Regions:
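Pyridoxal 5′-phosphate
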Residues: 1-176
Length: 176
């Protein structure tokens, strides 16, 4: 078989979707070409950039049921967001639950926080690569502050039932 004799089928869409939708390409192109640095002046391009950012914050706040658009923060990428959230949320003495399915972008900051006194429980996956919600619930302690887990594993392709975990964490007053 030679190159070109077959078409590629791309399966790793959990984090790194290869083909971006046309709307994403168009929005990035517009952002690169219009050059309206938000918050850097009072000319029309700057004001339009500021409106676009605020409108995006408003839509995200609505989608995530946040208190206000000002609660929405943009970062350079998901890894940066995870580091900010994990390191900003956890303190020595806190307990956090995660799963064996997590990506290094989650595990590395959790291990770093563990070295600083955060207690970490890693829920094991079964032979099919699934984590039991009952096992997560059994790991909850009075000092459990959060459950941090992926929705879709880029290793197994399995989805985690985040609706059930969300309901459980609400019941216990734990962040998710």
């Amino acid at each position: 078989m030679r190159k070109g004799d077959f078409s590629m089928i791309y399966f790793d869409n959990a984090a790194t979707t290869r083909q971006k939708p046309n709307e994403v390409v168009q929005a990035v192109t517009e952002a690169l070409c219009l050059l309206g640095n938000a918050g850097r002046g009072a000319h029309e391009a700057t004001l339009q950039a500021s409106r676009t950012i605020y409108d995006t914050r408003r839509k995200l706040a609505e989608f995530f049921h946040a208190e206000s658009p000002e609660r929405m923060v943009f970062t350079g990428n998901a890894t940066e967001s995870l580091n900010i959230a994990i390191k900003g949320l956890l303190n020595p003495g806190d307990h956090v639950i995660t799963t064996q399915l997590e990506h290094n972008s989650v595990l590395r900051p959790l291990y770093e926080m563990e070295e600083k006194g955060v207690e970490l429980t890693i829920v094991k996956a079964d032979v099919q690569g699934r984590c039991s919600i009952a096992d997560m619930e059994a790991a909850i302690r009075p000092e459990t502050k959060a459950i941090i887990c992926t929705h879709g594993s880029n290793v197994t392709g399995n989805l985690v039932d985040i609706a059930a975990i969300g309901a459980m964490t609400q019941k216990y007053g734990i962040l998710f």
